[in-house]
Amino acid sequence: MTKQTEYKRKPEWLKIKLNTNENYTGLKKMMRSKQLHTVCEEAKCPNIHECWAVRKTATFMILGAICTRACRFCAVKTGLPTELDLQEPERVADSVVQMGLKHVVITAVARDDLKDGGAAVFAETVRAVRRKNPFTSIEVLPSDMGGVEENLRILMDAKPDILNHNIETVRRLSDRVRARAKYDRSLEFLRRAKEMQPDIPTKSSIMVGLGETREDLLEAMDDLRANNVDILTLGQYLQPSKKHLPVIRYYTPAEFAELKEIALSKGFSHCEAGPLVRSSYHADEQVRSAKENTVEAK
């Protein structure tokens, strides 16, 4: 079997059953009516049917649908972004009410065209959701916002329940995989977030199957723990289109189980690992587990 056929032919464990019941259809209509975007759709997440139809959860993507970066793994559109929509925070908050969410994830495209990287709108979205949904836990998943400390502080001052920022891949592959992002800058971003708000759990995610070695993965885990990251998610990279980076290898469920055990042994309070795991997959369970472990640690 050639490397090309290896990454084009998905193994059985990556095949999913689509479920488009009334919850899924209703949520899709609501998102369009409120002119909102979800990373579930834009990034072609394989779990969209489970989350929307079964769990009735979604990850909102704010600051528009066009990213200023062109990472070679990502399906989100790139180009010249639209103007900021200052009413977007309230629409997101209203949607959380309508959906009855207990946990919401708010992510965004990278906005390198903005001085604050979109931090002010991000923070206002957190506050709007909190005002209208006081019992909903809030997870934020920002870009590195240019690595500017003040931008991160604006977001952390809004006090989300969890700060998620993905390193995406291992150090050796980072420059090839992540356009305009830096491995060490992401680690610093995570470290600073914990320093600013020590009681807020931090989280990061790694895709596998891009050509990394076992040693690369162990090093990345150690790097995250050295910067006090609490939660790790590990999932299989899937090629969105022929224009994106190819899959070099598919990891088996058994390999993911082993990586999870290794991550937990290194001190992560929670690790979600599996072929279809994505950063926001079962996010409600992750934040609950992290908080329980934080209480036990105290």
Swiss-Prot record:
Residue ranges annotated for the Radical SAM core domain, each copy included: 53-269
Name of the gene this protein is made from: lipA
Catalytic activity of the protein: [[Fe-S] cluster scaffold protein carrying a second [4Fe-4S](2+) cluster] + N(6)-octanoyl-L-lysyl-[protein] + 2 oxidized [2Fe-2S]-[ferredoxin] + 2 S-adenosyl-L-methionine + 4 H(+) = [[Fe-S] cluster scaffold protein] + N(6)-[(R)-dihydrolipoyl]-L-lysyl-[protein] + 4 Fe(3+) + 2 hydrogen sulfide + 2 5'-deoxyadenosine + 2 L-methionine + 2 reduced [2Fe-2S]-[ferredoxin]
Pfam families listed in its UniProt record: LIAS_N, Radical_SAM
PANTHER family the record matches: LIPOYL SYNTHASE (PTHR10949), LIPOYL SYNTHASE, MITOCHONDRIAL (PTHR10949:SF0)
EC category name: transferase
UniProt-listed CDD domains: Radical_SAM (cd01335)
Name used for this protein in its record: Lipoyl synthase
PROSITE patterns (UniProt xref): RADICAL_SAM
Cofactor(s) named in the record: [4Fe-4S] cluster
Any one GO MF annotation of this record: metal ion binding
